[in-house]
């Protein structure tokens, strides 16, 4: 059961709510779920040891699920949380909430005939909605305890499964299940007897368009505020990968918060390019903490492990590295930590992507005032000539790449320059990191660099400023120059695990061949006939493709699991 699991039921009337709950109440109790909020029209159930705070509205017609902070990073008191759930949740109110508050939350409000759901802009808490028997269901996770409540008509959407296979590993907003509606990060979704409608209250492009170029945000202040608020006084397992982003998260914690970290974990492999212990050790020495070094050996890749991660509304791309996730999950449990703290998302929000499009942004934003030195530095950084033909080619390639994406954040990029649009695409992809994984069953997986304050700071800065001087994440490096060891700041390479994963997957080819070529996807005609030729050690080690195979295996396990779940539900 995911630590962030909960299901909210809102009845059209009290009788409909009780009819829905009564036959499932014992099932919930046997599985360790309990009622967290109860009112005539509304009920919330979650695992007894779950990590989501649940506060019912004072009038009984709304609920706040998760944690929420004000602009100064202070958590709202229970009374204020209860008041927040009392107010009507229309577009104006939703915009005010997203402007005044941030966090990891869902805000739900019932009114006559419909239910309004606001999902926070970070997307840290999942949200899927549906209707059945006069009740609106809002789920943050897909544990099979909820199966009796799923729509009777719900089934596998093979068209969406095919889309997942065409673009393996990428976050896809639409669900491969019918009659279930995903709510995007920053979306206000209203659903009721007469149907529903949606408004995207927060989107990255709007943050960029509203920016004040004369008053750039304080990137460091935004990071420190978010990291410290989300960490709170809890006990954590923290990632120290050896990269810049996890080093920044470590630096942003207060001294007292660092003292509460139960383990600073670095995973390494016996390949030079995948061994970042020297960098992680430098961060640990800088803060006077002990580094836990975990040597990686192969991948635990079998049907049982893949199925363990398949209880999600989508194939769990965030669980693509089973050994990493299993190790963190075990440490959370053994050390009685609240969850894991990571640097995920920093590449997108701080702009790590090497691209000529940054030069095009300089021209786009400054027109005739474009600075020649900026263009020269970009060309030198990328070792490519900054010809207009090259810029146009890269721009066309980026537009083509995101054309098949379905995320609402990408639906309106008008007046957003090319490199900034690339950043928005990267942030949409990073919703993968907010998704479920085995480690999130033991405790919340918190990614502070994907929080609303940090995303807004990164989006409000131009791509030129973020990469000033022709350096990836230059603004972040400058902001934390006094807090991160120079060994990290001056580093120009990134850890590379491709060779390790390639060899690890190659060792599991006999299993993958049987699992994929004789599985549900093959039966549905969705496996490329050429896959057989790619399932060889030579092809994998010399031409790559391990990520595609792992994603295919996850999708296969997901289809098998949901086929069984839906079949049992109908018996």
Please report, for each region that a protein language model flagged, where it lies by residue.
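Short, well-ordered alpha-helical scaffold segment located
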Residues: 142-144, 454, 511, 557
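Short, hydrophobic/amphipathic alpha-helical patches that form generic packing surfaces
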Residues: 160-170, 327, 421-436, 547-564
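PAPS-dependent sulfotransferase catalytic core
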Residues: 354, 486-542
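Structural motif
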Residues: 92, 96, 152-156, 410-422, ...
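Short coil/turn segments at secondary-structure boundaries
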Residues: 174-184, 230, 236, 390, ...
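Cysteine-centered catalytic environments shared across enzyme families
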Residues: 1-299, 306
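ATP-dependent adenylate-handling active sites, centered on carboxylate activation for C-N bond formation
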Residues: 13-16, 113-116, 121-127, 131-132, ...
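Long, Lys/Arg- and hydrophobic-enriched amphipathic alpha-helices
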Residues: 316-325, 529, 533-535, 543, ...
